[in-house]
Curated annotation (Swiss-Prot):
Protein's UniProt name: Caveolin-3
Residue location of crosslink Glycyl lysine isopeptide (Lys-Gly) (interchain with G-Cter in SUMO3): 38
Organism: Rattus norvegicus (Rat)
Tissue expression profile of the protein: Expressed predominantly in muscle.
GO terms of molecular function: alpha-tubulin binding; calcium channel regulator activity; connexin binding; enzyme binding; molecular adaptor activity; nitric-oxide synthase binding; potassium channel inhibitor activity; protein-containing complex binding
């Protein structure tokens, strides 16, 4: 019994990320399309007070808009969903590849080189600027400012 539980736990831990279960109810769990794509009839068509169409026309227009948007989206997603998913998967794979194999190594290389330069810069500052400003500080240390009120 204990061995079965351990094997089941290992199976869950080793589970491939490409086989994770997807939520078919909440298809936007991170709400990335909350304000952008959510367009209803009331967001597009509105009749101001005093210029109303017949109630039947309004109902049929609402139904036509809603049903046509629903089925047009379904048709487009059926025809283009998989090819576009393939395209976007390829694009983000290329971006990830470039980031992992080009951008990060370039940044690390730059940081290594700039660290060497920063040591040389720091040495120059300590060698030339620190004594200069210390001397200027000594020269200016005897300056006294006196404020008087006239009145």
């Amino acid at each position: 019994m204990m061995t079965e539980e351990h094997t089941d736990l290992e199976a869950r831990i080793i589970k491939d990320i490409h086989c994770k279960e997807i939520d078919l109810v909440n298809r936007d769990p991170k709400n990335i399309n909350e304000d952008i794509v959510k367009v209803d009839f009331e967001d597009v068509i509105a009749e101001p007070e005093g210029t109303y169409s017949f109630d039947g026309v309004w109902r049929v227009s609402y139904t036509t808009f809603t049903v046509s948007k629903y089925w047009c989206y379904r048709l487009l997603s059926t025809l283009l969903g998989v090819p576009l998913a393939l395209l976007w998967g390829f694009l983000f794979a290329c971006i990830s590849f470039c980031h992992i194999w080009a951008v990060v190594p370039c940044i690390k290389s730059y940081l290594i080189e700039i660290q060497c330069i920063s040591h040389i810069y720091s040495l120059c500052i300590r060698t030339f600027c620190n004594p200069l400003f210390a001397a200027l500080g000594q020269v200016c240390s005897n300056i006294k400012v006196v404020l008087r009120r006239e009145g």
